[in-house]
Structure formats: structure tokens, C-alpha cells
């Protein structure tokens, strides 16, 4: 029986499939940095000066917009049912005054702007709650209650935002919910806004763009473990909140980590343009799929002379490629939607978005949209031009800069996305990973190459000496390249690890992009402390996983089969969901797992009958072999041994793999 229990313990293979849905990280309290040299080298200060050249960081217009309509600010913390802190409103109180030497002044300005948190009036009958999460929660007053636009990441912060709003605006019911797009920071807290039972009982309309549920539950399921691990770097979830660590994400302060759920839409907007009346108020929706998200719309509220740009518009250059990992976004399509939106905002006196602060006044609204439209289009067109001239992605990224009319405009600065990695994204979109150089067609794996480079350079001591010279000269990119090879050739080389960590410190402190800063500083932290001890707490995802089709989990299951151990096996397993009244046939052949929704196969090696809730408990590691055999919620017909053998083939990915070492 020991073998069978081992197999079923491995059935928690999917415990990390949705890790990426939380945007990354599992630490509710940030790690403290190890003692490190606090020397900010002159090259970093020079980089700060260069990034601010020609830019008026003292321009008061954005600060006036960020403060406009302020009603009240929250204090204290938001906790979960167990008393764990989900959100601390005072965590970024240190962001004030002049920029410290360890933060790019331009990024510090963005962090100051994002520090304006609380309840704000956008227009008559429209309010926003900012700083309760990385995204905004918007309230639009209908005839009888509040229509909620986006619901943050976590149930706890969404509930806190609603309670705070009601204290100041009155205890009105939720009469509609709008999800602008399929990223979790805009829907994950929905059950903190209104319960599924209340929404159903009162027939509250829940509006979302076409394809919303599939995109919301699928983008991160297959690659969720890898995305979640990488997102720890991008969002700096392990970093301390201080001037040497996390100061901002570029889009907002940070990501809230609590219970994530989903309120299933009752109305899908599937036309290019579609009008709806919600609680007596007219909305005009425009679908923009494949802009910032695969499923997304923007909308106007004509009666309020207001337009919501969702996340297609923001006060930063956004990502065409997100560093946590995802499919590349289409710059040409995104720019095209922004061009169309110039007509959609006709008559609007305010544009509000689901990150950052609004823009008021028709001339400023047009400028806001035009600059973003042209930034994405310029990056696209110039990357294609240089690509057709024979340049590779890295070469284009090194050469490409925005024209000064765009570069000096603060709302398309690279606080989140950057021109450099967006140019590489455009190259990848059209050309993929191969740059056409024969030497790059089948290169040596990185660790093998690293060992040979170190040997070629004269050994570890010689490489370390060269890296010190590069570091002292302020050539931190070259120092990082040398030290990457040295650390990958020998992860136990403490001197190399520390110098690489110090190099990443300098690169992070220099960066204008918050994700770049977070990536570098998390790399430095992990060189000193190692990877996290555990991945995402999966139980927080149960409410979301309930809405994920079984097929999504089976796709992830197929991708977790260890091909080497599966070779030569031929197994058929029936999965019967008694509560869903559906069954799936899984067949393993040629070390490939296929699955079909079909009646149980008569010749199956085993049939496992269970309920969806118990299946989810298995996936999240809350149930194992003992519960499978004794819970009374399952039945096994056929070979128990074959069923255990099948589950033993599935790799468990805890989401704590090393990134800066091997």
C-alpha cells in the first residue's frame, strides 16, 4: 500500500496549476534582506540623471489629478479569517519626499503618485477606491444602488473597499457587477463585493466580455506554476517594503494575497459595440480582445459623460510581454484599438481606468490616448523596420528609443513595460525565438556553456577578478553576464554569488521600471537567501477553481506526466464526476495522456468516481490517499494498483524552483 499512497500523494500535481492566477508570490510578510553593502555606485546616480534628462519630474498636473476628488483614506490593515495580514495601508508610508539614492527618481515619482490612496470622486455618481490592491475598484451609482466595476484580486480587500465606500457614500446594495477583463486583479475579489447567493437571488447582472470565463481560468492553469514563480520576481513579493526593496509595481503599490474567487457572468458582451442598461443607466461597451488581455472591453457612460479605458489605457507604457511569462500581446492591434477609442470618447469629460488616476477635459483626454496609441505603434513599426534590416531582438532593443515627443511624456514612461523588452516582444511576435544565426540553432545548454566559458577565461578566480573590474567600472550588465556564467558553473561559489547579488542591487536601484527593479532585487535576495521554502497557498484558490472546467485540469495533468517513467505503459482511467453528471476517459499511450469527455470506457484499468469538490481538494493537496480510500465521497472500480501507478506518473511542481542558480 506504500506505493499506492506515494502515488496518490503525487496526485497533488496540480496544486500549483493556478499559482500564476495570483500574479505571483506567496509571502504575506516580505523577507528581510541580508546585510549587504550599501554603496550606490556613481554609475547608478549617472543612470538616474540620464533617465530624467529632458523630463520635468516636478510637473504638478499628475499629482493634481491623483488627488482630485479625494474623500477619505483608509488606515491600518486588512486581515483574513485566520488573522493573517492581507493588506497594510501603511506599508508604503516611507515613500515621501525626495527620491533616495537607491530608487530611480522617475520611478519614485510614480510611487508617490500611487501613494494617493482612498476613496475618490471621479464625476457625479462615479467613485474609485484606489490603493486597496494593485488595481482600482470603481463604483457607478445607478437608480437603486452601486454598479461595481472590477473587484480587485482578493475577497478580503474587495470587502474592505466596499465597507469603506459605504461608510462614506451610504449603505446601498450592489445592483450590477462589471468585469472589464480576464486578469485576476480585476475579478478575484468578486465574492467580497457580493455573494454568489445574493447575486442569484436578486438577479444582479454580472457583465463581462466574450470569452471571459475561459480566459480567466485557462491562461495560468497550464503554466501556472512557472508563471507564479516568475511573478514573485516581477512583483517583488519577497522583497521588504523599503527604499532598498519594493517601492511600487508601476501599475499600483502591490498585489493583495487573499482568497480568490469568481462570480460567473450572466451577460456576455460579444458584439464589437453593444449597449446595455444596468440599474436604469445606459452603458455602451466596445470589445477590445487581444489588447492588454485576451478578453477585454472598454465602455462609456453617456449620461455621466465618462469613459472607462479598463487596462487598455494607463499612466505608464504597458507590457507587450509580461516578465512573469505569457503569450506576447499584439502591439499593432493594441494601437489600433486606441485609435478607435478617440471616437468612442467623444463627449466624455473624464476617462477613468482600472489602474492609476483619471484624466479630465477633452483636450487632455485626446492627448492621453494619442500618446499611448503612438508609443505602441512606434515600437511596433520601428521594430519591424529594423527586423527587416536584419537586426535581432536584442540588437533592436539596444538601438530603439521613442521620439522625444513621446519619450518626455511621463504617461508613457517605462514604469511597467519598457521600450527595450517591448521591442523584443514585437520581434518574438513575428519571428519567434530563433534569430537565424546558425550558432544559435542548437547551442549548448546554459550550465554546460557556463563551465566552458569559465575554463576558457582561465578559471573561477580569473572570471571573478574580471567581474570585480567590471563592477567597479560601473559596467554592471557585463559584470552580470560574467557572474552568471560563474555562478551557474559553481552555485557554491559564495564570493561569486555575493558579487552577482551586489551587481543586481545596482541594476535594480538604477531601473526606472518597477518590474525590472523587482526582478533584479529579487535575484539579489535569492542569491543571498535561496528560493522560497514554499509556493502559493493553494487553498486560497478553491473558490476560483470551482469555475474552472474539468478539461483545463486534465490538460495540465497531461503536461505533468513524466514521459520517461510513462514510456511503455498503456493505461485507461475513467474519471466520473457524480455531481456534475459528466465523465472523462483518460488514455495513456506512447507516454502521452489524452482525455475525452465521454461515457466510461468498458475496458478501463480503473474507474474513479468522485465529486468536483473532492477533486479540487485532491488538486490543492487538502486530500490524499487516505481520504481517497475512506472519505465516502469516492468509489474505485477496477485495479487500485493501476490507478496508483497512473497517479505516480504525475510530477508535483511546488513552484519553488531556483532561477538565479542551478
Predicted regions and their residues:
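Divalent-metal (often Zn2+) His-rich catalytic cores of metallo-beta-lactamase-fold enzymes
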Residues: 36-48, 52, 306, 316, ...
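Metallo-beta-lactamase
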Residues: 121, 145-147, 153-155, 170, 214-288, 333-345, ...
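Active-site metal-binding motif and surrounding structural segment of the metallo-beta-lactamase
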Residues: 144-145, 155-206, 270
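C-terminal motif of bacterial Sec signal peptides marking the signal peptidase cleavage site
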Residues: 22-25
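Feature captures hydrophobic
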Residues: 28, 475-481, 488, 492, ...
Amino acid at each position: 500500500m506504500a506505493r499506492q499512497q506515494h502515488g496518490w500523494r503525487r496526485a497533488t500535481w496540480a496544486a500549483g496549476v493556478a499559482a500564476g492566477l495570483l500574479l505571483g508570490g506567496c509571502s504575506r510578510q516580505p523577507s528581510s534582506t541580508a546585510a549587504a553593502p550599501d554603496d550606490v555606485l556613481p554609475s547608478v546616480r549617472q543612470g538616474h540623471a540620464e533617465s530624467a534628462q529632458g523630463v520635468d519630474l516636478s510637473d504638478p498636473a499628475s499629482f493634481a489629478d491623483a488627488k482630485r476628488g479625494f474623500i477619505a483614506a483608509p488606515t491600518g490593515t486588512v486581515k483574513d479569517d485566520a488573522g493573517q495580514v492581507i493588506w497594510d495601508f501603511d506599508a508604503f508610508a516611507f515613500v515621501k519626499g525626495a527620491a533616495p539614492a537607491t530608487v530611480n527618481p522617475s520611478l519614485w515619482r510614480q510611487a508617490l503618485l500611487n501613494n494617493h490612496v482612498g476613496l475618490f470622486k471621479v464625476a457625479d455618481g462615479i467613485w474609485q477606491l484606489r490603493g486597496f490592491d494593485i488595481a482600482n475598484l470603481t463604483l457607478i451609482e445607478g437608480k437603486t444602488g452601486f454598479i461595481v466595476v472590477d473587484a480587485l484580486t482578493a475577497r478580503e480587500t474587495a470587502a474592505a473597499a466596499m465597507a469603506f465606500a459605504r461608510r462614506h457614500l451610504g449603505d446601498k446594495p450592489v445592483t450590477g457587477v462589471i468585469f472589464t477583463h480576464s486578469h485576476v486583479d480585476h475579478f478575484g475579489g468578486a465574492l467580497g463585493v457580493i455573494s454568489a447567493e445574493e447575486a442569484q437571488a436578486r438577479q444582479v447582472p454580472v457583465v463581462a466580455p466574450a470569452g471571459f470565463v475561459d480566459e480567466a481560468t485557462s491562461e495560468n492553469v497550464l503554466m501556472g506554476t512557472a508563471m507564479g514563480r516568475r511573478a514573485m520576481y516581477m512583483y517583488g513579493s519577497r522583497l521588504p517594503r523599503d527604499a532598498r526593496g519594493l517601492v511600487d509595481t508601476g501599475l499600483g503599490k502591490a498585489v493583495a494575497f487573499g482568497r480568490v474567487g469568481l462570480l460567473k457572468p450572466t451577460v456576455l458582451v460579444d458584439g464589437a459595440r453593444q449597449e446595455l442598461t444596468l440599474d436604469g443607466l445606459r452603458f455602451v461597451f466596445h470589445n477590445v480582445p487581444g489588447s492588454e488581455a485576451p478578453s477585454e472591453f472598454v465602455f462609456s457612460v453617456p449620461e455621466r459623460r465618462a469613459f472607462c479605458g479598463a487596462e487598455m489605457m494607463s499612466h505608464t507604457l504597458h507590457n507587450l510581454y509580461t516578465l512573469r511569462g505569457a503569450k506576447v500581446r499584439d502591439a499593432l492591434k493594441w494601437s489600433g484599438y486606441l485609435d478607435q477609442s478617440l471616437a468612442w470618447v467623444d463627449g466624455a469629460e473624464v476617462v477613468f481606468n482600472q489602474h492609476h488616476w483619471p484624466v479630465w477635459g477633452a483636450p487632455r483626454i485626446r492627448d492621453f490616448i494619442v500618446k499611448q496609441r503612438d508609443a505602441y505603434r512606434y515600437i511596433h513599426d520601428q521594430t519591424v523596420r529594423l527586423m527587416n534590416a536584419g537586426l535581432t531582438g536584442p540588437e533592436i532593443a539596444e538601438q530603439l528609443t521613442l521620439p522625444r515627443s513621446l519619450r518626455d511624456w511621463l504617461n508613457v514612461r517605462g514604469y511597467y513595460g519598457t521600450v527595450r523588452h517591448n521591442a523584443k516582444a514585437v520581434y518574438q511576435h513575428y519571428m519567434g525565438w530563433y534569430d537565424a544565426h546558425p550558432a544559435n540553432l542548437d547551442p549548448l545548454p546554459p550550465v554546460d556553456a557556463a563551465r566552458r566559458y569559465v575554463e576558457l577565461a582561465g578559471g573561477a578566480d580569473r572570471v571573478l577578478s574580471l567581474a570585480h573590474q567590471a563592477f567597479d567600472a560601473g559596467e554592471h550588465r557585463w559584470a552580470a553576464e560574467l557572474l552568471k556564467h560563474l555562478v551557474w558553473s559553481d552555485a557554491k561559489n559564495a564570493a561569486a554569488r555575493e558579487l552577482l547579488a551586489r551587481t543586481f542591487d545596482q541594476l535594480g536601484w538604477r531601473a526606472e521600471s518597477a518590474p525590472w527593479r523587482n526582478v533584479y532585487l529579487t535575484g539579489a535576495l535569492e542569491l543571498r537567501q535561496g528560493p522560497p521554502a514554499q509556493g502559493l497557498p493553494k487553498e486560497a484558490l478553491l473558490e476560483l477553481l470551482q469555475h474552472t472546467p474539468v478539461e483545463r485540469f486534465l490538460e495540465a495533468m497531461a503536461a505533468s506526466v513524466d514521459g520517461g517513467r510513462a514510456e511503455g505503459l498503456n493505461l485507461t482511467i475513467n474519471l466520473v464526476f457524480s455531481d456534475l453528471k459528466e465523465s472523462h476517459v483518460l488514455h495513456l499511450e506512447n507516454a502521452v495522456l489524452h482525455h475525452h469527455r465521454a461515457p466510461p470506457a468498458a475496458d478501463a484499468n480503473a474507474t474513479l468516481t468522485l465529486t468536483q469538490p473532492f477533486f479540487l481538494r485532491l488538486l490543492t493537496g487538502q486530500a490524499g490517499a487516505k481520504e481517497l480510500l475512506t472519505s465516502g465521497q469516492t468509489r474505485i472500480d477496477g485495479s487500485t494498483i493501476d490507478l496508483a501507478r497512473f497517479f505516480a506518473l504525475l510530477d508535483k511542481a511546488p513552484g519553488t524552483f531556483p532561477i538565479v542558480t542551478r
